Amino acid sequence: MKKLGTLLVLFLSAIILVACASGKKDTTSGQKLKVVATNSIIADITKNIAGDKIDLHSIVPIGQDPHEYEPLPEDVKKTSEADLIFYNGINLETGGNAWFTKLVENAKKTENKDYFAVSDGVDVIYLEGQNEKGKEDPHAWLNLENGIIFAKNIAKQLSAKDPNNKEFYEKNLKEYTDKLDKLDKESKDKFNKIPAEKKLIVTSEGAFKYFSKAYGVPSAYIWEINTEEEGTPEQIKTLVEKLRQTKVPSLFVESSVDDRPMKTVSQDTNIPIYAQIFTDSIAEQGKEGDSYYSMMKYNLDKIAEGLAK
């Protein structure tokens, strides 16, 4: 009997070692997967797929700039303890002050084992400015087709780490991506009806290149990315001169930037700011745009309305 007990202990130990080596977590006992997302957009997509099956921590607070961020002690702790970490990649958290690179290095986390870029598979667009030329444009989520890629990558890694809930994740993924796909198709039809001479989305940061490509609306901006100088007199003058040659009816300003440079552009061109829109963050809970889906629907509706005036 003693020998049998010893063999049973060895057998169970072997199972635990295999599970640890494969990176899978045993969630049958009710212990949830610990997941970290770098920003509110990725966190919301993750929540739509994982529901209450995980413990989720989002690092960059709603409304703050994910390009350059200083992690708090809680972020460091949660990252160190995480079973799975999702980040955007393509020059967002790893550009600027490279805060995410430092965070995962200090937590001794390994890429494609502990942390994964949800943008894997996106058709990347590159920056064009003198100081940023050749670097990746990180704002891929502003094209709903890329949001679907994000969701699929998230579901894949959740299922790999937590196979006990794979069916649950895949069911939620299907429902969620069908919803995003429907909004994407409806929005493309809407933008196709706007006259070509009115099609120009003007924002503070040049974050809408992926949006432009997806919905056939060229973009113009004051500065290209939030890691460079923002709203200099020269940048404003360049945009004002460009807009005077167009028939664009409306300007837009993002919720996460200083609106003063765009107000100057509006005054100098007599083109009104139609609406505040979202780029790097969803809205606070309970407000319009408080999820990735509602943020994108709000953006698509407001931009179409503003350009149709």
UniProtKB/Swiss-Prot annotation:
The keyword Nuclease does not apply. It is found in: Cell membrane. A lipid is attached at C20 (N-palmitoyl cysteine). Changing G30S: In strain: NA-1064/97. Residues 1-19 form the signal peptide. GO terms for molecular function: metal ion binding. Keywords: Cell membrane, Lipoprotein, Manganese, Membrane, Metal-binding, Palmitate, Signal, Transport. Changing D83N: In strain: TIGR4. Changing V9I: In strain: NA-1064/97. InterPro entries: AdhesinB (IPR006129), Bact_metal-bind_prot9 (IPR050492), Lipoprotein_PsaA-like (IPR006128), ZnuA-like (IPR006127). PROSITE patterns: PROKAR_LIPOPROTEIN. Changing A207C: In strain: NA-1383/97. Changing N164S: In strain: NA-1383/97. PANTHER family: HIGH-AFFINITY ZINC UPTAKE SYSTEM PROTEIN ZNUA-RELATED, METAL-BINDING PROTEIN HI_0362-RELATED. Zn(2+) can bind to PsaA but cannot be transported by the permease into the cytoplasm. At high Zn(2+) concentrations, Zn(2+) binding competes for Mn(2+) transport impairing growth and rendering S.pneumoniae hypersensitive to oxidative and polymorphonuclear leukocyte-mediated killing. NCBIfam families: ABC_lipo_SloC. Belongs to the bacterial solute-binding protein 9 family. Lipoprotein receptor antigen (Lrai) subfamily. This is Manganese ABC transporter substrate-binding lipoprotein PsaA.
